[in-house]
Amino acid sequence: TQMVKSIVEHENITVELCRSFTQKMRTDYDHVFFSGALDAFYSCQYGRLEYRTLDFKKILCQRDYQGCAVMNYCSIDIPYTRITEHKYFSPWEQHEASICYQEYSRECEADDIPYYPVRRADKMDLLNKYLSRAKKEKNITFIGRLGTYRYLDMDITIAEALQTADVYLTSLYEQKEMPAFTVTV
């Protein structure tokens, strides 16, 4: 989208791919906004929090596949949770063929990419250890789904990112300390 393009092309932003954050990197910046997994930030010192991950299956089709960009599947009889047909994200373009992806959700293992936090009552003690430690941090703010360990839809994620930017700019202007979380966790 134009919003993402303007962010990644901004002169003050450098995008680095396939590079994991390390604690040593914190000294390179005045303030860090961390959107990775909260437990991973602390090298899972207290244990791993629970996440769901996704596997994707690509479908190539020489026609229209489902007639819309995203179709969610909530039936226990269907093994995937969603199909995304990307050509519908840009309806002004004409495409003969279509590329779709089926999304399969499963429990996240140690080497998987976490997508969705799984907050469970029986795991709150573990989460609270990480939250308590994070709230004591200086010069870092935990953001997004993984950083705040909450399920968030994208519209809420973007709204919270904008709110966090406002809080940060206000803290700079008023010379106040930026909190570790700008939302209730």
Show where each model-derived region lies.
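C-terminal lid/capping helical subdomain adjacent to the catalytic/cofactor pocket in oxidative enzymes
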Residues: 17-18, 30, 51-62, 69-70, ...
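A conserved beta-strand/loop element that lines the FAD pocket in flavoprotein oxidoreductases
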Residues: 7-22
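Hydrophobic/aromatic-lined pockets within catalytic cores
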Residues: 8, 12, 37, 42, ...
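Short, structurally constrained coil/turn elements
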Residues: 7-9, 77, 136
